[in-house]
Amino acid sequence: IIFVLQQKNSKKNKVDFIQTKEEERLVEKLRPTDKIILLDEKGIQFDSVGFANKLEKLEHQGFKRLVFIIGGPYGFSTVFKNQFTDHFALSKMTFSHQMIRLFFCEQLYRAHTILNNHPYHNT
């Protein structure tokens, strides 16, 4: 899990400035061998089993790391979004990025229990 501190918001900092600063910090932590997936409200939605299956396929593609990026309060700039082809959405609803961290970690755990036939996920 890569954690990047969000840019402090002030009256003089415009949204594009905040997005750029957060994205610069993110890029510093990425490696060329990473598979990057943005968590974005306009991304592809999965149910839990579908997400588990997608995760399994990604894990078998030979990437050193799967990196899921959660944007800050203002999301990602269009330029940043366009650098990556994979965008997943957890919901059509809007949540704080802190809540998405929690929800996404639970879904990662759930996906692994589904793939390992663990009873955590009841179908």
Which residues does each PLM region occupy?
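Short active-site-adjacent structural elements
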Residues: D47, F76-V79
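A short, terminal or domain-edge coil/loop segment
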Residues: V49-K64, S91-Q98, P119-T123
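Rossmann-fold NAD(P)-binding glycine/threonine-rich loop
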Residues: G71
